[in-house]
């Protein structure tokens, strides 16, 4: 943070006719609350969306923005394969924070075609099939929402996986049309996240008490032993480097990684 406790003014970034404020050069020195405040004040609440999967990180961020005068739009994606505990949590979150969480859904015709061609559990077949499922059920609905804004807030943390260890607190997302990607908890540890949740007595997914560190679609999430990489509970039949849905890492890159490590991956049981 610059002298005086305020961020350095952002210049304007221009690409393909779109004008967007550049990221403050001292952003990595900001705390989580400051990251959110700078994003809201620079872009405006109507041009910023908080994307939540209702994971622990999202709960912390919702609490951080709940006492701000201006709040971003909040969205979540119902993929059609979420566990019941996640649906229950959504109602608890709405009640606790008094916010309108907009539920995005995949195109029914796209889901129907995919299931007809490859079956309901195609994600076990290959990385490409799994990415197709993630893209139709999760990525595309959120991508449509991101096309309407200048920035999105995520719960990404560097320690979550090998694909996220370089996550900046504020970055530019070119995959979704040149927008800010706001990661206020990038440098937080899992312990810090859970300490915050328990200290503030915030709601969370009860599956976390059953050994699920990461909760996504029901068939693609599982409980794991303590001390294991958090993302190993997601898409565990794939190599660690490919365990992303395509929202935060380009799908083509994930697919290439998956194919290059195919000989290291055990078939799904």
Question: What does each model-found stretch correspond to?
Answer:
Residues 2-269:
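Nucleotide-activated chemistry modules centered on ATP-dependent adenylation/adenylyltransferase
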């Amino acid at each position: 943070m610059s002298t005086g406790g305020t961020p350095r003014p952002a210049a304007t970034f221009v690409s393909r006719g779109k004008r967007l404020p550049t990221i403050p050069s001292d952003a990595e020195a900001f705390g989580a609350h400051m990251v959110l405040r700078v994003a809201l004040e620079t872009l405006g609440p109507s041009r910023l969306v908080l994307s939540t999967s209702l994971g622990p990180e999202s709960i912390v961020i919702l609490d951080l923005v709940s006492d701000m005068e201006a709040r971003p739009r909040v969205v979540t994606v119902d993929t059609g394969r979420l566990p019941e505990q996640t649906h229950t949590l959504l109602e608890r979150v709405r009640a606790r924070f008094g916010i309108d969480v907009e539920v995005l859904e995949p195109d029914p015709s796209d889901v129907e075609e995919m299931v007809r061609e490859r079956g309901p559990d195609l994600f076990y077949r290959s990385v490409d099939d799994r990415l197709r499922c993630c893209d139709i059920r999760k990525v595309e609905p959120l991508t449509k929402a991101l096309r309407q804004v200048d920035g999105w807030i995520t719960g990404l943390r560097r320690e979550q996986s090998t694909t996220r260890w370089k996550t900046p607190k504020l970055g530019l997302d070119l995959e979704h049309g040149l927008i800010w990607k706001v990661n206020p908890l990038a440098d937080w540890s899992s312990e810090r996240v859970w300490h915050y949740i328990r200290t503030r007595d915030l709601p969370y997914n009860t599956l976390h008490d059953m050994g699920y560190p990461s909760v996504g679609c029901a068939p693609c999430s599982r409980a794991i032993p303590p001390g294991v990489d958090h993302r190993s509970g997601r898409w565990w039949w794939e190599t660690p480097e490919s365990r992303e849905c395509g929202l935060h890492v380009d799908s083509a890159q994930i697919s290439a990684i998956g194919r290059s490590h195919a000989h290291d991956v055990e078939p799904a049981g």
